[in-house]
C-alpha cells in the first residue's frame, strides 16, 4: 500500500542522507525528515503515537482478536497472524527457544550487560551520571521501565515465579552457566515473547503471533534523527514537531521522568 511504500522511502532516505552513503546523491537530512514526516502526519504526528507501542507484543487481547488485514495502532506493516508452529516467529516457538530452562525454554537469546547498562534510571539519566541515583547494590531498582519490560534479570518475576540468574544460585537451572541451555550473560530475552504461552510438553499452549516488518516507532525515530541533523533538536522545518518533541513523547510513554 501507499503508506508502506512511504515508510520504506523513509528508511532509505535516512540511510542515503548519511555521510557514509550520501556521495553522489541529492538526498540530505532535511529530505529524510520530510519523508518520515509524510508517514507520521497521516496519523496526526506525535499525537498519533500509540500509548502501548513500546510493548505491542504484550497486548494479547488485541493480538488474539485481530481481524485479517487489520493492524494495531503501533504497527505499520505486519505479516499474517497465526498460531501455527511452522515458523520461528509463530505458535510458541519463540517462547520454547527463549524462555528460561525452568519454564521449559532453551534460553537461546541472552541480552548482554552492555545492553542492560544502556537503560537509564527512571529519571532519564544514564547510570554513570551522578544525578541518576543509580544504586550499584540494587542495580535494577528505579530503572527505565522498559528494562523490566524487555529483559528478564535476576529477581524478575515471570509467569508467576521469581527467576534467579545469579552465579550463586543452586538447584536452579536458570542460573548463570548452570546447564547447556542456561543464560551465558545473566539475562534472558523477554521482548516479543507471550507470557501466556507454555512450552511445557505436558501442557503445551500455543498463542497467536504475527511478524512485524515496520513499526511507527521506527519512523518516529527516523524523523528524530533526520530532523536533529537538519534543524537541530528543537527545529521542525515545516512540521509541527521537532526531534525533541518525538524523543520526549517516547520517553514519556515509557514512564521516564522528564528531566529537561
Where are these regions (language model features)?
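Acidic/polar-rich alpha-helix caps and helix-coil junctions
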Residues: 1-95, 101-113, 117-260
